Swiss-Prot record:
Subunit structure: Homodimer.
Family per similarity comment: Belongs to the ribose 5-phosphate isomerase family.
Protein name: Ribose-5-phosphate isomerase A
Originating organism: Cereibacter sphaeroides (strain ATCC 17029 / ATH 2.4.9)
Assigned keywords, A-Z: Isomerase
Lineage of the species this protein comes from: Bacteria, Pseudomonadati, Pseudomonadota, Alphaproteobacteria, Rhodobacterales
GO CC annotation terms, alphabetical: cytosol
């Protein structure tokens, strides 16, 4: 166990810890996927253990489900929960309007389904994830394996008419083979550099035969919690205009630190 957290882990913990403060007893929660979301699951488990907090968690990936169960959080399916009070998840990028790119962890389909079945979505991130324009991070698109190369060609053709700076499309690999999502689909990464009209692009991509879902989350995120390497944390809510600043007790992080993976 490291004696001190790195600045990036400090930022992730700070955001996760503040977001978990929003959880109330009896809530049904969407549990995100990724390294920042893993911090959130551990912070939530700490409240369950120490406060007797009663929650049900709907995980957005197999690895999140495994972590939540191992830490004593009650895990249910979305069909069992039906509707969620709150989803907390990370993001690869977010802009001033809280539009997101997600899917770096290849869980974008379940993440979007869970987020849109929630009263509120809270994104947790370090400050580096905030951008003026989406697109520096590759945009993941989940596609059916059957005919994926034809789907790729159709995506490339669609990009010709879009307000983007790059148009390279690559198949995401795991070793020498295509990476498989939890639904056994492939991921195509779109290297766009800058996305001028995220809403237009998201709608166009989902019209292509073979595309299951894309990693643009538009009008889904309500609140962003941003952590910093010194333990400072800010919360911004899009609807209410609420903005607050604070600082997290980093001794709490050291007490629950473990190998989170991603």
């Amino acid at each position: 166990m490291p004696a001190e957290l790195s600045p990036i882990d400090t930022a992730k913990f700070a955001a996760a810890r503040r977001a978990v403060d929003l959880v109330q007893d009896g809530m049904k929660l969407g549990l995100g996927t990724g390294s920042t979301a893993a911090w959130m699951v551990r912070c939530l488990a700490e409240r369950v253990r120490e406060e007797g907090l009663r929650v049900q968690g709907v995980p957005t990936s197999t690895r999140t489900a495994e972590l939540a169960r191992a830490l004593g959080i009650q895990v249910v399916t979305l069909d069992e929960a039906k509707w969620l009070d709150l989803t907390i998840d990370g993001a690869d990028e977010f802009d001033a309007d809280f539009n997101l790119i997600k899917g770096g962890g290849a869980a974008l389909l379940q993440e979007k389904i869970v987020a849109t079945a929630s009263d509120r979505m809270v994104v947790i991130a370090d400050a580096a994830k905030e951008v003026a324009h989406l697109g520096a991070f590759p945009l993941p698109v989940e596609v059916i394996p059957f005919g994926w190369q034809s789907t790729k060609m159709l995506i490339e053709e669609t990009l010709e008419g879009m307000d983007v700076l790059g148009r390279e499309v690559t198949l995401r690999l795991s070793g020498d083979a295509p990476l498989l999502t939890d639904e056994k689909n492939y991921i195509l990464d779109l290297h766009l550099k800058r996305i001028g009209e995220p809403r237009q692009l998201g709608l166009a991509l989902n019209q292509i035969a073979g595309v299951v879902e894309n990693g643009l989350f538009i009008d889904i995120c309500d609140t962003v919690v941003v952590g910093h390497g010194d333990g400072r944390v800010s919360l911004r809510d899009l609807q209410s205009g609420q903005a607050e600043e604070g600082c997290i007790d980093m001794d709490r992080a050291r007490n629950i630190f473990a190998d989170l993976g991603d």
